[in-house]
Regions:
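Single, function-defining residue in the core of a domain
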Residues: 1-36, 49-52, 63-66, 70-82, ...
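Alpha-helical residues within the helix-turn-helix
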Residues: 39
Length: 374
């Protein structure tokens, strides 16, 4: 497996050549399509580990033979490094670790990706991701067929004691939730359908200002659910003024406030934003191979890229966003310059641009931003 390397202070991170499409999609498409506009840089190709021109068919054949587990293990290793470097960088309203778990489906054409299976008339793969909310980094990822139900992979999550796990209603599986409770972890999950239960304790708590409508301790009485989850559960009804909708949450934590439970669920959107970022800025919609191996390799390469960019952002570019760092890297792969020097000059330019925007804005309008409790 060919690699290029990025050095961040005393650490060197080898990056698979398969990650180049994520780092620089424009350059890669030109290279693969045989466009000659990169001819002046041909003597610099060795810097990227390239030899002769790479065709799409050659890359497809190579990825067909490669074992995606190598890329999976490397992605998980970079995830571990990125989480370690970002831990404690941001203040959070709760001291426990908080994770949001969800999946995103990458649609594939069944006639081309023949190994996929139909699910609701569509074929594709699912990327199931456990997202570290406090550190804005994925902590676990697994790829399955689109036909696999979300709750079926809950038993593969590496649960941590005293940590919170936030789930959407697709994960309202009482058997899996009870397994989380047995580990000593906490969950917050949205109600999927009306549950059959009896009230054990009604806290008679109602706060229209924050949206909490009720906070009760219940016991499931359904024929199946009472066997799968025999302990009391906390049920919170919350009204969201912004969306004009009522939500029902279940949790096994009885200590945090009802408002905090609702706020924790709002942070579930962080994993949705991560999926949106990945699909928008990294190449996981167009694949260079049609086999299952090729698809998995490219998805894991994209996750590797995200983690690498996050590490560089944390170590060298605190004033820049993850996307801004990605843009700099994608346009500078053929530039032989120390990363710190490259990013430092970019940060200075960004600060000047921001100052100019603030000055121009203040000339014409004075913004009043209301305090939003939520």
């Amino acid at each position: 497996m060919k690699t290029l390397s990025f050095s961040v202070d005393s650490s060197t991170f080898p990056v698979p050549i398969s990650a180049i499409p994520s780092l620089s999609p424009v350059m890669t498409l030109m290279k693969l399509s045989g466009v000659t506009s990169l001819a002046p840089f041909r003597n610099m190709f060795h810097h990227l580990g390239f030899g002769a021109n790479v065709t799409r068919s050659n890359l497809s054949k190579a990825n067909e033979q490669r074992d995606p587990r190598i890329f999976e293990e490397y992605a998980l290793k970079l995830i571990s490094i990125a989480r370690e470097k970002r831990t404690g960088l941001k203040d959070f309203f709760i001291s426990n670790n908080v994770y949001a778990f969800d999946s995103t489906t990458i649609s594939l054409c069944l006639s081309v990706f023949w190994w996929t299976k139909l699910h609701h008339g569509k074929s594709g793969v699912k990327v199931h991701t456990l997202f570290d909310v406090k550190n804005s980094i994925p902590s676990f990822a697994i790829i399955t067929g689109a036909e696999i139900h979300d709750s079926q992979v809950m038993d593969q999550i590496p649960y941590e004691v005293d940590s919170f796990y936030i789930f959407d209603r697709a994960y309202m599986d009482t058997k899996q939730l009870y397994a989380i409770d047995k580990v000593g972890a906490f969950f917050v999950v949205r109600e999927k359908q009306r549950m059959v239960y009896e009230v054990v304790e009604d806290k008679r708590y109602n706060n229209p200002k924050t949206g909490v409508m009720s906070d009760t301790l219940i016991k499931l009485t359904g024929q199946k659910t009472k066997k799968q989850y025999s302990k009391p559960l906390r049920r919170i009804v919350f009204y969201d003024k912004e969306k004009n909708r009522t939500f029902v949450f279940y949790t096994n934590n009885i200590e945090v406030s009802a408002e905090d439970v609702a706020l924790l669920y709002k942070y579930r959107w962080s994993v949705e934003l991560f999926f949106k970022w990945m699909k928008q800025h990294l190449r996981i919609k167009e694949f260079y191979g049609t086999t299952e191996n090729a698809v998995k390799i490219q998805v894991y390469a994209a996750i590797t890229t995200y983690c690498l960019v996050s590490i560089i952002e944390t170590e060298m570019a605190e004033e820049m966003t993850t996307y801004e760092v990605l843009r700099v890297l994608s346009t500078s792969l053929l530039i032989k310059m120390p990363l710190r020097q490259l990013l430092s000059s970019c940060q200075e330019e960004l600060l000047l641009e921001n100052k100019r925007e603030i000055i121009n804005t203040n000339k014409y309008i004075q913004l009043e931003i209301p305090f939003d409790e939520w």
